[in-house]
């Protein structure tokens, strides 16, 4: 298990280039399973979760050529379906929640799909019912082996239908879309997630020959086609990393420019940080954050405490609530953080309290942060990263704290952030990796 050793309290300065979006990559990397032709994808983040998925696809029989860092050519001409029932497949796929995304394409093209209960962040209950309910409506039959924790699904022929999801699941939406594009007839898909990741997937599939309309809305119409071809696709910049860097700049009183952010795909993210009092400026497609000595949290117009909560797109992404919480610890004023979509994402606050933050954990979904207004600095401590987003939030806290911090289990951070320690050192951070 590796660790980061950080000496905090340093002001940083410079430019950061954003990696490709992890959440998009885990979806679009599975789309080549829908065709025997070559698919080229660029701006793929070089992170643990994505590399695990690439390795899994290769082991399944997908031919993969690395053109350069971040750009690969995929060709799923000869898939070994028998491998999908082996112990090796079960072990590999179980270590990665993104492995669930192979089921829709396999079901659409080969009439069957298999997946063990997938892994991922321990951030609360993350049910898979949405995926399999959608597949069943398309005509598939589902089986779950409780002893093996192994899902299997098959269909002689998928048929277009009306689907109304009970939740706007991002991965569920992506999986069902990939199944429906090769179904017979038309699928009307209501309460679909419409995050930029989903929009990107739909655009990619259309460039492969799919017929998807309603992109960017929660009502999609998918006309099934007989086959798909190859394409070129470029992954968007990672909005979660962009938000993380905004929080980093504010907490460390640093002047940072974030390059090529695809501003039009950031939604409410910039304005949510502005509500904490953070100054940021759009410069072309870059974000400039000046060094700020202090920042003050807004209140509602009646003077009551501001509440920031997550919601399906176009609401505020749950992946950035932990960053918002950390940033609020050094603000003037107070804020209620309401994590509606997951019940275990706020449990890392005990580590921030140990660092000197004033936080009241109301229940598994809500925390009130009383900002210190820089009257008292956080202090360095030893801690363990519980998941990707909490891990990078603790990293930001450590970079702003006085003294030495050590963060263990940084493999969690590596799952979502490419070369994070190298990029931070380039800005002037005192951080080193200990193996």
List each language-model region with its residue ranges:
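Short, structured segments at the rim of ligand-binding sites
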Residues: 1-435
């Amino acid at each position: 298990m590796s660790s980061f050793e950080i000496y905090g309290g340093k002001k940083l300065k410079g430019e950061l280039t954003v990696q490709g979006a992890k959440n998009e990559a885990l979806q679009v990397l599975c789309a080549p399973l829908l065709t025997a032709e070559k698919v080229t994808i660029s701006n793929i983040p070089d992170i643990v979760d994505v590399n695990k998925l690439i390795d899994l696809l290769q082991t399944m029989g997908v031919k993969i050529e690395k053109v350069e860092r971040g750009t690969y050519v995929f060709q799923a001409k000869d898939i070994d379906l028998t491998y999908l029932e082996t112990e090796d497949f079960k072990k590999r796929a179980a270590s990665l929640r993104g492995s669930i995304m192979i089921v829709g394409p396999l079901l659409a093209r080969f009439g069957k799909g298999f997946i063990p209960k997938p892994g991922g962040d321990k951030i609360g209950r993350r049910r898979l019912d949405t995926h399999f309910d959608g597949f069943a409506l398309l005509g598939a039959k589902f089986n779950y082996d409780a002893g093996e924790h192994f899902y299997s699904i098959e269909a002689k022929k998928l048929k277009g239908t009306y689907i109304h999801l009970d939740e706007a699941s991002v991965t569920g939406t992506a999986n069902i879309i990939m199944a429906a594009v090769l179904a017979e007839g038309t699928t009307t898909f209501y309460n679909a997630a419409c995050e930029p990741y989903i929009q990107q997937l739909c655009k990619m599939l259309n460039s492969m020959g799919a017929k998807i309309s309603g992109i960017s809305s929660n009502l999609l119409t998918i006309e099934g086609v007989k086959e798909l071809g190859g394409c070129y696709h470029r992954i968007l910049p990672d909005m979660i990393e962009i938000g993380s860097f905004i929080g980093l700049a504010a907490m460390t009183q640093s002047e940072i420019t974030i390059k090529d952010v695809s501003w039009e795909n950031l939604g409410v993210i910039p304005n949510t940080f502005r509500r904490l009092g953070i100054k940021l400026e759009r410069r072309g497609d870059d974000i400039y954050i000046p060094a700020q000595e202090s920042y003050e949290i807004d209140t509602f117009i009646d003077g009551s405490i501001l509440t920031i909560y997550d919601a399906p797109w176009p609401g505020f992404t749950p992946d950035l609530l932990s960053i918002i919480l950390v940033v609020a610890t050094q603000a003037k004023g107070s804020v209620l953080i309401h994590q509606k979509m997951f019940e275990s994402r706020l449990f890392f606050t005990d580590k921030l309290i140990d660092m000197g933050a004033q936080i009241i954990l109301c229940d598994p979904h809500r925390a009130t942060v009383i900002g210190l207004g820089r009257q008292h600095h956080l202090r360095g401590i030893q801690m363990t990263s519980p998941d990707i987003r909490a891990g990078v939030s603790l990293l930001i806290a450590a970079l702003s704290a006085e003294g030495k911090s050590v963060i263990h289990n940084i493999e969690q951070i590596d799952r979502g952030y490419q070369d994070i320690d190298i990029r931070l050192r380039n800005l002037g951070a005192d951080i080193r990796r200990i193996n």
